[in-house]
Amino acid sequence: MKQTEVVPTITPLIPESTSPILQDVDEDQKYISLFPVYTLRAACGYFGNMEPVSMLGWMRVPWNTKKDRTKFIVQAVGHSMEPRIHDGDYCLFETYKGGSREGKIVLAEHQGEVDSDYEGAYSIKVYHSKKVFDEDGYWQHESITLQPLNRNYDPISIDTEDADSFRIVGEFIDTIEVE
């Protein structure tokens, strides 16, 4: 049987004194070379804890972009996305705007049975879905699978009954190297 990671609530993996998360930043650099970092921990295993999500601060990326408020940063926890994403990596995502997700690394949220004060649970995985079409040409998901890259971990299957409590939050862009 493969491993299923249960990720406890943890403190940041980088000590606060050397944290790459900035508080006081120039307004003109926001969303160009600095992007917001959120407190959610995206499990590289099964869905993470039901933690409230808030902004921690800003993190510098090693490149500039056009001003883009759709990008954000979260910290990965766990080993299921190795070798691409490691435990503690800061990951840059772009807010999901629609379109095909097939084969892409995504940040997924699964609300399930959670307290309404919390945002839900998050996981980083490769997205796969099978669709079925009816006689009118409309499709629906037959199955959704979130696949880890590390073969020591099982994929996560989303039941069609749970599809309403599941959504893609963002598409993975890259990890950010912390100095």
Regions found by a protein language model. Give the residues of each.
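Glycine-rich, charged/polar anion/phosphate-binding loops
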Residues: 21, 59-61, 92-93
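Short structural boundary motif marking the start of a folded domain
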Residues: 30-35, 72
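Short beta-strand/loop turn elements enriched in aromatics
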Residues: 39-75
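Acidic/glycine-rich C-terminal interaction modules and beta/coil loop segments
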Residues: 64-179
